From Swiss-Prot:
Signal peptide location: none
InterPro entries, per the entry: MFS_dom, MFS_sugar_transport-like, MFS_trans_sf
Organism: Xenopus laevis (African clawed frog)
Name the UniProt record assigns to this protein: Solute carrier family 22 member 16
Function recorded in the entry: High affinity carnitine transporter.
Superkingdom assignment: Eukaryota
GO annotation (BP), single: monoatomic ion transport
Gene Ontology molecular function, alphabetical: organic cation transmembrane transporter activity
Gene: slc22a16
Length: 566
């Protein structure tokens, strides 16, 4: 089927329409993946007094309104409040004390006090945020752990959705799954805003994660099956750029809308335009051909010819001769499992390194993104910048891997990101502008590495286990995204703990990456023996001579990008 693009064009008008229409929907994936940054915000809070407050005392000030005290109050202090009935309370974040003697009002008091729990709820600072799920369901103090599980549970849904929908799409086609998942994104996205308690919120968000991940996986395959080999690298890489646009939209909507359920509805409406037109998308020619639906392939070719203004009709039999079907090939691909990735010590070392790259890339990506709101300065601008720096990073990744090689681009940027993490740890905490700038540089570096690992993994393994290699690497990627929120929560232990963990992982992984063979200009391997020889002078020379004698420049990456998103 690859010859089809030599005839109709590798990225003609028809492909451009499908590409931008389908890639547009990946914006919503970026939105939902990071929406919790502002949905689950914990503002300043303090235990609620049982009645109406008439006076508020701070260590060095007094006011009549609690709203006026938030700016001066810090969590290490308690508030002294006098109620309209004369009772005096000392309010902490997770407890409150009632003074026995209410005859005089002072901040400091050495008399008897009675300890009470926060059974009346909490006061929240609403100066910058009207509501979040934390304020809605009091996810603080002994319920704080529930708030911290929101993003990991979502990422677990991402992992499961990628596995389930990727497999179903191979069985029933890409188009039905695109319909189901994009519609699911809209419906579940809206439903999240109307959940009635924490548990219903988490369940619906989990389902939203599954369909969002399913769409992202399948649309990646869908688009690469419509783009010819000459444009496939750039086209597949820049699907990620649409995801980055979604991250920027999250920051913009979060800045404008401070009520969590309205914020969620507005973000979910970005899905609606695609839902209304996704039924018009055709099935891919690769999947139709693999299912023996040749008449539908012929019909699709006629449509592409019309859109791309191809004047000379061509038959499917001319593009795909019978001898290219390789009827016996599938039987050779069924007997392999993940243990084959540990074929020998050399392969085991290669696989462990590749898995570490996937894990570290995902870990660093989400740590930089999720932690951006903790850097100081304007948290909305910080998140916007983390999305904005991704777009040029993919351009650099494309240029680098085509000019200096995959390994020679990947390893330096991993090491650079590690160095940047170290530099961030040395910056004084009052220099927030410098910290933000270095964090953006770190996000840029890790995004370069994360962007090209899909293709590099496929090139490192032979045809018989290539799907397994990319699929298992993708699984490590999802695990990294589940772990990332917990790393960010370690700022409670030490503010630079996330950067330290990412820095250590990136440095070790970058060094190990240097032990991998370079694949730029090297034909794809078909057997374990050929792949094992990759990187040796004799192996490269022998295989280059073989491909040149057959008049082949490089084996097409037909199934590489299909499995890259699995």
């Amino acid at each position: 089927m690859e010859h089809l693009f030599d005839y109709v064009g590798h990225f003609g008008r028809f492909q451009a329409y499908l590409y931008f229409a389908s890639a547009f929907q990946t914006i919503s994936c970026g939105i939902h993946y990071l929406a919790s940054v502002f949905i689950a915000v914990t503002p300043k809070f303090i235990c609620r007094a049982p009645g109406n407050i008439s006076t508020v005392l701070l260590p060095n000030a007094s006011t009549l309104r609690l709203e006026d005290a938030w700016e001066s109050w810090t969590s290490k202090d308690y508030l002294v409040v006098q109620q309209e009935n004369g009772d005096i309370w000392e309010l902490n974040q997770c407890s409150r004390l009632k003074r026995e003697d209410a005859s005089y009002l002072t901040y400091f008091y050495d008399g008897n006090k009675t300890l009470f729990s926060c059974s009346n709820g909490y006061h929240y600072d609403k100066s910058n945020l009207e509501s979040s799920i934390v304020t809605e369901w009091d996810l603080v103090c002994d319920r704080e752990w529930l708030a911290k599980l929101i993003q990991p549970i979502f990422m677990l849904g991402v992992l499961i959705g990628a596995v389930i929908f990727g497999d179903i799409a191979d069985r029933v086609g890409r188009r039905p799954i695109i319909w189901i998942t994009s519609t699911g994104q809209f419906l579940f996205g809206i439903a999240v805003a109307f959940t009635f308690d924490y548990y219903s919120f988490v369940i619906v968000r989990f389902l939203l994660a599954m369909v969002s991940s399913g769409y992202y996986v399948v649309v990646f395959v869908y688009l690469t099956e419509y783009v010819g080999i000459k444009a496939r690298t750039w086209a597949s890489m820049h699907v990620h750029a649409f995801f980055a646009v979604g991250v920027m939209i999250v920051s913009l909507v979060g800045f404008l809308v401070r009520t969590w359920w309205i914020y969620q509805i507005i973000l979910s409406l970005t899905t609606l335009p695609f839902v209304l037109c996704c039924w018009m998308l055709p099935e891919t020619p690769f999947w139709l051909y693999s299912q023996g639906k040749y008449k539908e392939v012929e019909k699709l070719i006629r449509t592409i010819e019309k859109w791309n203004k191809i004047s000379t009709p061509c038959k499917l039999s001319e593009l795909c001769p019978a001898q290219e079907t390789h009827v016996d090939q599938p039987n050779t691909l069924k007997n392999h499992n993940v243990l084959d990735l540990f074929y020998n010590w050399s392969f085991a070392r290669r696989t462990i390194t590749v898995w570490l790259i996937w894990f570290t890339g995902s870990l660093g990506y989400y740590v930089f993104a999720l932690n951006s709101v903790n850097l100081g300065g304007n948290e909305y601008l910080n998140l916007f910048l983390t999305g904005a720096v991704e777009i040029p990073s993919y351009i650099v990744a494309c240029l680098g891997m085509d000019k200096i090689g995959r390994r020679n681009t990947l390893a330096p940027f991993l090491i650079i990101s590690a160095v940047i993490c170290g530099v961030i740890m040395l910056i004084p905490q009052d220099h927030s502008t410098v910290t933000i700038a270095m964090s953006m540089a770190g996000k840029f570096s890790i995004a370069v590495a994360f962007g090209l690992i899909y293709l590099y993994t496929a090139e490192l393994y032979p045809t018989i286990v290539r799907s397994l290699a990319v699929g298992s690497g993708s699984m490590m990627c999802r695990i990294g995204s589940v772990v990332a929120p917990f790393c960010v929560y370690l700022t409670d232990v030490w503010i630079f703990m996330p950067q330290m963990l990412v820095g250590i992982m990136a440095f070790l992984t970058g060094i190990l990456t240097l032990t991998l063979p370079e694949t730029l200009g090297i034909p794809l391997t078909s057997t374990m023996e050929e792949a094992a020889e990759m990187g040796t002078t004799s192996g490269i020379t022998k295989r280059k001579a073989l491909t040149e004698s057959n008049g082949v420049v490089m084996e097409k990456l037909d199934q590489t990008t299909d499995n890259a998103a699995s």
